[in-house]
Amino acid sequence: MFSLSLPKLCAALSAGVVFWGAAAAAPGGSASPAAPEGAPKDAASILRICAAEKQPPFSLEDGTGYENKIAVALAEATSRKPQFVWSDKPAIYLVRDFLDRKLCDVIIGLDTGDSRVLTSRPYFRSGYVFISRTDRNLSVHSWSDPVLKSFGHIAVSFGSPSEVMLTEIGLYEEDMAYLYSLVNFRSPRNQYTQIEPSRMISEVVSGNADLAVAFAPEIARYVKSSTVPLKMTLVDDDAARSDGEKIAQRYDQSIGVRREDQALLDELNEGLVRAKPKIDEILASEGIPVLPVTN
């Protein structure tokens, strides 16, 4: 495995909505794609993977992120050597600051159909989950459950569907100070700010939060490793705003490449078919609940 570190990029930070993702599988045949402009001369034998240095459990510079493992499995399935191009920024900036600048060629971790890139067909689907202590004996499956309004604190990620629904059921204002306390009261307005997935789980374990609601892939690792038994329940996909607009709770996950890199995408789709057993093993080891893909 190769590892390539790049100097810090100095683009101004801006607050944004967070998107989650991973990779996909699809048929299709093509010759090895030509090297993108700016790629090394031996690019056809290397898979340059855009990755965040410190975004657990997705990506970590030591390669222990589950998306790092998926990237390696995909590279091996395409007979390429994985080369990680590391960013010291959150993954939300990888498309703009790395992929679009042709510093790397592939992102593991995008929702299927992300309009900024070409995405492969999904290789797995998962959803948001309610996390609680097992000894609480809670049985919450939907944002429409009235029991939610009896809870003291519910931990959710900023910019997530869970934050939207916390607002919709009228609990966000009273929970806001608590949520900001989890990031030392840093505002996400002028900088990227997010609650660490591990912190959300520790809040449930300690009893500071009655419930956490998060995308299963970002917290499954911590639920699985918790010394206090925790219950993880998929959120029913019936959430909606007061005006009837659906707030999706489940997402297909894909690999992303630049819009002009169709040949590379075709090759990756073929590789994903071959890598599927290994990818499924990685997801199972992580404890991520998977659903049938729909796209």
What are these regions (language model features)?
Residues 53-56, 60-76, 130-189, 195, ...:
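Bilobed "Venus flytrap"/periplasmic-binding protein-like clamshell domains
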Residues 52-55, 125-137, 184-186, 224-272, ...:
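Periplasmic-binding protein-like
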Residues 29-116, 191-194, 285-289:
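Extracytoplasmic small-molecule ligand-binding "clamshell" domains
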Residues 1-13:
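Bacterial N-terminal signal peptides that target proteins for export
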